[in-house]
Regions:
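Short helix-initiation/N-cap motifs at beta->coil->alpha
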Residues: 65, 80-91, 138, 172-186
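Ligand-binding clefts/hinges and TM-proximal coupling segments of bilobed small-molecule sensing domains
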Residues: 23-24, 157-172, 210-214, 243-266
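Beta->alpha turn/N-cap motifs
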Residues: 42-48, 82-87, 96-108, 131, ...
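Periplasmic-binding protein-like
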Residues: 122-130, 196, 200-243, 261-266
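Flexible hinge/capping segments at coil-to-helix
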Residues: 131-148
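Extracytoplasmic small-molecule ligand-binding "clamshell" domains
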Residues: 23-104, 113, 257
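Ligand-binding cleft/hinge of the Venus flytrap
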Residues: 51-55, 68-77, 140-144, 155-175, ...
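A ligand-binding cleft/hinge motif common to bilobed small-molecule-binding domains
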Residues: 88-91, 104-113, 161-164, 185-219
Length: 266
């Protein structure tokens, strides 16, 4: 069923069953998407394996780039990518700068107060990156010690998690692109905290970097897509999309291509 026919059916059913809800249907993001024939998708273009823009070619790649394009195909519309970041996520979504944010967004209590999430499609624990030459950090237990500097990106889920977890180490919160990586490479910080997708791609491209993994589960976070609250119709359509890409194998195929099959949520 085309997007226009789907919307018409929803309007008809809502008007018959609940006349007061008809306006809600026509005010849905789906109505705007159908009208302009494009869905606006917020991404963080520095997210390796998820929504990464190659600085040389400007080409976008990653599992959520693939899934955004699949969403456009399912809706029968084009896809317009909108640059965002974790620091700007809530503002961009709630101010309607995009219809949906699709960059493996960790579902946290703070974000859940402001945004509405789909069911998760990925889930990742937290990992650390240090330099191969760092003598202070030999394993995970060396991170939370006096004198250690731990870098995180502002607005990421790692900021509140590490604020609550660290007891002895110093937390350094940075809000410019690749600042945490530069702090570690320069030696001003000992480690930066990240997730599985980013760590795998980063290690493949940074000869100086070394992965530090937790000995067991540290803080696994589900990743999902996020929209502005109050649009039940758009949320239901996205939930159907997430269920579809899990069932028909599109999500797993893309995850395998980008080396992320281990963190697909089932």
């Amino acid at each position: 069923m085309s997007l226009h026919r789907l919307l018409a059916a929803l309007v008809f059913v809502s008007t018959i069953a609940h006349p007061a809800l008809a306006q809600n249907v026509t005010d849905s993001h789906l109505q705007r998407i159908a009208a302009v024939k494009a869905v606006r998708v917020c991404i963080w273009p520095d997210y390796y394996s998820i929504t990464y823009r190659n600085p040389r070619t400007q080409q976008l790649s990653g599992v959520d780039i693939d899934m955004a394009n699949e969403l456009g195909k399912d809706l029968g519309v084009g896809v317009q990518f909108v640059d965002s970041s974790f620091a700007k996520l809530i503002e961009d979504v709630t101010q309607d700068h995009c219809d949906v944010a699709m960059f493996a967004i960790g579902v946290t209590p703070l974000r859940a107060e402001k945004l509405r999430f789909t069911k998760p499609h990925l889930a990742s624990d937290i990992f650390a990156i240090t330099t191969k030459s760092n003598r202070r950090i030999k394993g995970w237990d060396d991170i939370d010690k006096s004198g250690t500097v731990v870098a995180v990106a502002k607005g990421t889920l790692h900021e509140p998690v590490m604020k609550s977890k660290l007891k002895a180490a110093q937390l350094l919160v940075l809000d410019t692109p690749f600042a945490r990586e530069q702090e570690v490479q320069s030696g001003r910080a000992d480690v930066f905290m990240t997730d599985y997708p980013y760590s795998q791609r980063f290690l493949a491209n940074a000869e100086w970097a070394r992965l530090v993994s937790p000995p067991g589960e540290y803080h696994v976070t589900p990743y999902a897509y996020a929209i502005k609250p109050g649009d039940d119709i758009w949320h239901a359509r996205l939930e159907r999309f997430v269920a579809d890409i899990k069932r028909d194998g599109r999500l797993l195929a893309s995850a395998k291509q980008h080396g992320l099959s281990l963190i697909v949520a089932h």
